[in-house]
C-alpha cells in the first residue's frame, strides 16, 4: 500500500492543484491551532518568542517522510541548544501521528492538519482529486512570528542540516 501511494504520489505530483497562496518571506506566519500526536492542542502563539522550524510533509510512515522526521529527531538537541523548536505538519490524523511518533521515537510536536486548513494557508496543500496532501516544504519563523525563510525544494536527506545552518547564521547575524 505504501509503495502504491508513493508511486501515485510521484506519478501525479505535477498534476496536483495548489490551493492557497504561499505567504512571502517577511510576512507574518499564518496562525494555526491543531492537535499533536498526543491529542494536545497547539497554537502558533504558543511559540511566540522562539525560533520555529515548521516542516510540512506528505504522509506518515512513507520513506521520504520517515527520513526527514528521523533526521530532525537525530538533530533535536542541536535545535534545542540554539533555542529553536521543530514542528512537523501533515494531513494525517492524531492516531496516525501517534503511531509514527512512537515507532520512530520522535521527540518533537507533529500536528494533525486533517482538513488541510493550515497547509492551505501556507500554500502547500496539493489536491490530487483522490487524496489531498501537504507538499514537502518548510518555513523558518522568527520569534516575532514572521516568516524569514521558505524552503520549497526539500531533500529529506539533507534538509535538517540546511535548516540548522540557516538558523545559526540568522541568529548570529542578529547578535552582531
Regions found by a protein language model. Give the residues of each.
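Short loop/turn microsegments at loop-to-beta-strand junctions
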Residues: 29-30, 51, 135-137
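Structural microenvironment flanking redox-active thiols in thiol-disulfide oxidoreductases
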Residues: 66-106, 117-118
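Structural micro-motif
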Residues: 106-108, 125-128, 132-139
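A short beta-strand-turn-helix
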Residues: 32-51
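Thiol-/selenol-based redox modules, centered on thioredoxin-like
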Residues: 133-176
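Short, acidic, Ser/Thr-enriched surface-loop or helix-capping motifs
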Residues: 23, 36-37, 141-142
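N-proximal helix/coil linker or "cap" segments that precede and/or mark the start of modular domains
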Residues: 5-31
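Short active-site neighborhood of thiol/selenol oxidoreductases, capturing the structured segment around
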Residues: 45-66
Amino acid at each position: 500500500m505504501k509503495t502504491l501511494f508513493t508511486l501515485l504520489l510521484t506519478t501525479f505530483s505535477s498534476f496536483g492543484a495548489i490551493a492557497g497562496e504561499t505567504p512571502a518571506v517577511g510576512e507574518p506566519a499564518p496562525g494555526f491551532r491543531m492537535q499533536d500526536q498526543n491529542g494536545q492542542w497547539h497554537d502558533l502563539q504558543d511559540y511566540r518568542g522562539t525560533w520555529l522550524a515548521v516542516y510540512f510533509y506528505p504522509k506518515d510512515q512513507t520513506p521520504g517522510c520517515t527520513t526527514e522526521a528521523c533526521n530532525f529527531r537525530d538533530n533535536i538537541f542541536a535545535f534545542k541548544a540554539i533555542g529553536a523548536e521543530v514542528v512537523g505538519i501533515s494531513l494525517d490524523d492524531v492516531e496516525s501521528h501517534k503511531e509514527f511518533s512512537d515507532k520512530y521515537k520522535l521527540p518533537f510536536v507533529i500536528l494533525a492538519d486533517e482538513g488541510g486548513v493550515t497547509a492551505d494557508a501556507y500554500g502547500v496543500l496539493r489536491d490530487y482529486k483522490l487524496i489531498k496532501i501537504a507538499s514537502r516544504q518548510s518555513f523558518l519563523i522568527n520569534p516575532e512570528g514572521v516568516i524569514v525563510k521558505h524552503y520549497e525544494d526539500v531533500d529529506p536527506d539533507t534538509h535538517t542540516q540546511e535548516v540548522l545552518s540557516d538558523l545559526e547564521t540568522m541568529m548570529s547575524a542578529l547578535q552582531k
